[in-house]
Amino acid sequence: MKTLVICSGGLDSVSLAHKMAAEHELTGLLSFDYGQRHKKELDFAQACAKRLGVPHQIIDIRTIGASLTGSALTDDVDVPDGHYAEETMKVTVVPNRNAIMLAIAFGVAAAQKADAVALAVHGGDHFIYPDCRPGFIEAFQTMQKHALDGYADVKLLAPYVHATKADIVADGAKYRTPFEATWSCYKGADRHCGRCGTCVERREAFHLAGIDDPTSYEDADFWRATTQKRNA
């Protein structure tokens, strides 16, 4: 199956790219510049495409991102510290982000005669991000069947939608994903901060998967205290 992967450069999507390269015919990686403060993630997506020997396209939607105000990822709002499963993390929502990206990706896939678009949403995203939930994935696939009816039949692959991030780490290890060549931190500094929701979730996932985490964090111990507090 000719598959186009939406790849941010993060652990989830890079692991997905390696999985799709092994299980399908990977036709390319598609990334989006929406004005995210952690834009350096795109360099990791580019490196992934080069490693897998496929084209990499970055689509500039910064003008759209500039209109999606109020998010800590695109606006002048601090990225909070803590675990994803906290109300404070809702400030990292970029409204309709996945819907916008997927609509573009399906158009690109149809134009390129690809059979599928793959997206790395997972179970850990459900609490905060509505456009990562199974209901959204199913509804979007249905909508695209109507949108491309008579022109193309493009499937939406979301193999991790019911999985945990620890499951993704285990799967990534299976497909030899170089985890050190992925970027998660929302703060976009030189090193992973170790304190934002995505850093905490990343560090916890390696721990739960029983796999060594090669990531260099500014605060390598914060995740333990915040996860213990959450589970208390």
Curated annotation (Swiss-Prot):
PANTHER family: 7-CYANO-7-DEAZAGUANINE SYNTHASE. Gene3D superfamilies: HUPs. It is an enzyme of class 6 (ligase). NCBIfam families: 7-cyano-7-deazaguanine synthase QueC. Pathway: Purine metabolism; 7-cyano-7-deazaguanine biosynthesis. Its cofactor is Zn(2+). Belongs to the QueC family. This is 7-cyano-7-deazaguanine synthase. GO terms for molecular function: ATP binding; ligase activity, forming carbon-nitrogen bonds; zinc ion binding. GO terms for biological process: queuosine biosynthetic process. CDD domains: QueC-like. Keywords: ATP-binding, Ligase, Metal-binding, Nucleotide-binding, Queuosine biosynthesis, Zinc. Catalyzes the ATP-dependent conversion of 7-carboxy-7-deazaguanine (CDG) to 7-cyano-7-deazaguanine (preQ(0)). ATP binds at C7, S8, G9, G10, L11, D12, S13, V14, S15, L16, A17. It catalyses: 7-carboxy-7-deazaguanine + NH4(+) + ATP = 7-cyano-7-deazaguanine + ADP + phosphate + H2O + H(+). Zn(2+) binds at C185, C193, C196, C199. Its EC number is 6.3.4.20. Pfam families: QueC. It comes from Brucella abortus (strain 2308). Binds 1 zinc ion per subunit.
